[in-house]
Design a protein with these regions (language model features):
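Well-ordered alpha-helical segments within folded domains of soluble proteins
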Residues: 58, 101-105
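Interfacial/capping segments of alpha-helical transmembrane domains
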Residues: 67-77
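Alpha-helical transmembrane segments
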Residues: 52-56
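Hydrophobic transmembrane alpha-helices of multi-pass, membrane-embedded glycosylation machinery
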Residues: 105-106, 205
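Alpha-helical transmembrane segments of multi-pass membrane proteins
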Residues: 59-68
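Juxtamembrane helix-capping/reentrant segments at transmembrane boundaries
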Residues: 79-92
Length: 271
C-alpha cells in the first residue's frame, strides 16, 4: 500500500511538471541530468568514496551500539504515538508532501513568472524521481527487518522475495527520511538567510524522531536515509548552480516587516 502511495505521488508530480517547461526547465534538461545522476557512482572521486564509507561506518556503529536500546525505549513509552509533533513528522516524510510542496512553487511560478519558483519546482521533481527508486534499490539489497518484526538488529534478507515485496523487510535506509531530507535540502539550499535554512530542516527533524519513536526504523536506518537524502538534494541544486538559466536565481527569502502600526512577514521570490 505504501509503495502504491509513493507511485501515485510520483505520478502527480510528473503529470504537473509541464508547468515548468520554460526557461530551460523542460524534459530535455531533466533527461540529461537524470542520466548524469545514474552515471554519477561510476565517476566517484576520493571524497565521494570517503563520504560513502563514513556513512556506512556510522550506520554500523549505530547498529552495534544504540539501535536496540533506542528501540526498546520506544516500545516502553508509546503514549506519544499520536502527538502533534509525531504526526507532523509522519506527514512531512510521507507521499503527500512532495506534490504539495511542488504544487505551491509550480503554481507560484505559473502565476508570477518567478524563475526561482520554477527552479525549486523542477528540483522537487528531481528529488522525488531520484530519491524514491534509489532508496528502494538499497532496501531490496539490504533486506533489513523493521524493529516491530522483533527479529533483532541483525536480521537481514538481502535480495530476497521478502525484501522485494514485503514492507516489513525494507527498513534500511529510511524512505520517509531520505525523501524528507532531500526536499528540505532543496529548500534550504535555495533559501537566503540562515534561519530560513534552519526552518527548512525542522519538519525533517520531526520525521526522524517519529520514525524512530514509532519503531518504524532503527536509528541507523534513519542516519543512512538522512545522509542519502542530503547527498541527493545537494547534488540536484549543485547542477543548477554551475550553469544554465538557474544560475541567475538567488533564492527565496522571508523578512520581518514593521511599518507604523502594522507588522508582519514579507516573502520574496526573485523574478
Amino acid at each position: 500500500m505504501r509503495n502504491r502511495l509513493w507511485a501515485v505521488s510520483l505520478a502527480l508530480v510528473l503529470c504537473a511538471s509541464p508547468l515548468l517547461a520554460q526557461n530551460g526547465y523542460d524534459f530535455s534538461r531533466f533527461k540529461t541530468e537524470t542520466w548524469r545522476f545514474i552515471q554519477k557512482p561510476a565517476h566517484w572521486k576520493g571524497d565521494d568514496w570517503l563520504k560513502a564509507g563514513l556513512v556506512c561506518a556510522g550506520s554500523v556503529i549505530l547498529a552495534a551500539t544504540v539501535d536496540k536500546s533506542v528501540s526498546d525505549w520506544g516500545f516502553r513509552h508509546p503514549k506519544y504515538d499520536n502527538s502533534v509533533p509525531i504526526v507532523i513528522g509522519e506527514i512531512w516524510g510521507g507521499p503527500f508532501s512532495p506534490p504539495l510542496v511542488f504544487g505551491f512553487f509550480a503554481v507560484h511560478s505559473w502565476l508570477t513568472g518567478s524563475e526561482t519558483s520554477r527552479k525549486i519546482s523542477f528540483e522537487i521533481v528531481q528529488a522525488v524521481v531520484y530519491t524514491v527508486p534509489t532508496t528502494f534499490l538499497i532496501k531490496v539489497a539490504v533486506g533489513r527487518a523493521r524493529p516491530k518484526e522483533d527479529r533483532g538488529v541483525d536480521y537481514f534478507r538481502p535480495f530476497s522475495k521478502d525484501s522485494l515485496l514485503h514492507f516489513n523487510y525494507q527498513s534500511f535506509p529510511g524512505g520517509h527520511i531520505s525523501m524528507s531530507v532531500a526536499i528540505s535540502t532543496v529548500l534550504a539550499k535555495n533559501a537566503r538567510p540562515w534561519w530560513l535554512k534552519t526552518v527548512a530542516y525542522l519538519p525533517t527533524a520531526l520525521t526522524m524522531a517519529s520514525r524512530i519513536y514509532q519503531n518504524k526504523h532503527w536509528t541507523s536506518d534513519v542516519f543512512c536515509g538522512a545522509a542519502l537524502g542530503h547527498f541527493i538534494g545537494d547534488w540536484i541544486v549543485a547542477q543548477h548552480r554551475k550553469a544554465g538559466p538557474a544560475s541567475g536565481a538567488h533564492g527565496f527569502s522571508i523578512q520581518p516587516y514593521f511599518g507604523g502600526s502594522s507588522f508582519g512577514l514579507i516573502a520574496s521570490l526573485p523574478l
